[in-house]
Amino acid sequence: MSESCIDFRKAKFLISAPDIAHLNEHLPGDAGVEIAFAGRSNAGKSSALNLLTDQKSLARTSRTPGRTQLINIFELDENRRLVDLPGYGFAQVPLALKKKWQESLGEYLQERQCLGGMVVLMDIRHPLKDLDMQMIAWALESEIPVLALLTKADKLKQSERMKMVNEVRKHLGDFDDRVKVEPFSSLKGIGKAKVLGILNEWCHPQWLTDAIADAETEEE
């Protein structure tokens, strides 16, 4: 059975939650597939989500990095969701608040069984900071595939861009195919089609495809 293409333009806001406990209170259960977006507070997560869904304000962007403190959930369909995790690592955020965010991120990655993939966004000019590597390690420990998305790729010339992409791929080479690395620009649309292809693949794990097919058979 060939997998259908998810229409990411249909994404709609579902809920916000300050931590995993509140998330579990609002969701119908740890079911379906969630794809999480994580990154430093100035990595461009909100802009990336808006571009990928063709919606100008699905995820709120802020000129003040660190403003987004909640876990925000967007529904694609009854079985699939996108998750905008709190930005991490911004220097001007109070230490206590920064610690709380990191605890929420850790809890989410360790406890959500439906997490089917994680996009770690990094400024292509400053990739692989300590917290970026920690997020990647957390995901891989939970056997979650990772897309390292090098944002703001339009800031570099083509040759410089590919040089940085190759350097990051080499650095993450020990993880084999569990980590994909792609350049991306919300401003110029660089990498959009490639990213949507990866997300679509993550949205179709075999167990979910089989479950949907079984449900359709029972309804006939």
UniProtKB/Swiss-Prot annotation:
GO BP term, pick one: division septum assembly
Keywords annotated in UniProt: Cell cycle, Cell division, GTP-binding, Magnesium, Metal-binding, Nucleotide-binding, Septation
Signal peptide: none
Residues reported to bind Mg(2+): S46, T68
Molecular functions (GO terms): GTP binding; metal ion binding
Keyword presence, Transcription regulation: no
GO cellular component, one term: cytosol
UniProt KW Signal keyword: no
Co-factor(s): Mg(2+)
Sites where the protein binds GTP: 39-46, 66-70, 84-87, 151-154, 184-186
Classification via InterPro entries: G_ENGB_dom, GTP-bd, GTP-bd_ribosome_bio_YsxC, P-loop_NTPase
Described purpose of this protein according to its UniProt entry: Necessary for normal cell division and for the maintenance of normal septation.
Family label: Belongs to the TRAFAC class TrmE-Era-EngA-EngB-Septin-like GTPase superfamily. EngB GTPase family.
UniProt-recorded name of the protein: Probable GTP-binding protein EngB
